[in-house]
Swiss-Prot record:
It comes from the Bacteria. One of its GO terms (biological process) is ribosomal small subunit assembly. One of its GO terms (cellular component) is cytosol. Required for maturation of 30S ribosomal subunits. This is Ribosome maturation factor RimP. Pfam families: DUF150_C, RimP_N. It comes from Mesorhizobium japonicum (strain LMG 29417 / CECT 9101 / MAFF 303099). The gene is rimP. Residues 180-215 are annotated as: Disordered.
Length: 215
């Protein structure tokens, strides 16, 4: 992943190479149907697999949403044809132990444990594990999980130095993620004027649809 800019992309962690080209194709499609891109990744496992990770603006993503995104982006990919070989299209939600790709993600998940890799050396390291203590406008403050002898207990990492950050699965994260998801779903139902039925406890907005597409 890289921080190469693209028009209309508010992510601080972005793709490079063929992944970046695919992201440019699918992002306008996603915005047009009310979704935002989290990540694009083309891998060579089991043939070629194109993973598109997306979510709604409120952070939710259902199985039906995955199917809608798959139906919407497939024609755009057929027209631009960025992948020369046959591949499987896999659309999924970010999941609970999600990657953090926007400044707003760091704000939303402040207080939770993350693993972070940087593109340059920061405080004599390129890998960090700790809690997000503060998410500012230009950087994020990480409270180290286990500071080595002589290291400061916290480190401030500029956003433009971050190569990848993922949440680490913990009991606190699961509880918080489910609470945020249930609240977002209820608010969405209220906006649509639908009955405010309770979302079953433990339900996750994590679903994947696989679609095979010939180049």
């Amino acid at each position: 992943m890289t921080a190469t800019a693209s028009e209309g992309d508010d992510r601080i962690i972005r793709e490079s190479g063929i992944d970046a080209r695919i992201a440019l194709i699918v992002q306008p499609v996603l915005r047009g149907i009310g979704f935002r891109l989290v990540r694009v990744h083309l891998s060579g496992q089991n043939g070629l697999t194109l993973q598109i990770m997306a979510e709604r603006e409120d952070g939710t993503m259902t199985v039906e949403d995955c199917e809608e995104v798959s139906r919407a982006v497939s024609p755009a990919l057929d027209v631009d044809d960025p992948i020369e070989k046959a591949y499987h299209l896999e659309v999924s939600s970010p999941g609970i132990d999600r990657p953090l790709v926007r400044k707003s993600d760091f704000v939303t998940w402040t207080g939770h444990l993350v693993k972070m890799e940087t593109s340059v050396i920061v405080a004599d390291r390129k890998r960090f594990k700790g809690k997000i203590a503060e998410a500012g406008e230009n950087d994020v403050l990480i409270e180290r999980d286990k500071a080595a002898y002589g290291e400061e207990p916290t480190v401030r990492v500029p956003y433009d130095a971050i190569a990848e950050t993922r949440l680490i699965l913990t009991d606190d994260l699961i509880r918080d993620a489910l609470s945020k998801d249930n609240r977002a779903r209820k608010e969405a139902k209220k906006r649509r004027g639908e009955p405010d039925d309770d979302v079953p406890e433990g339900a996750e907005a994590d679903a994947t649809e696989e679609h095979e597409q010939e180049s």
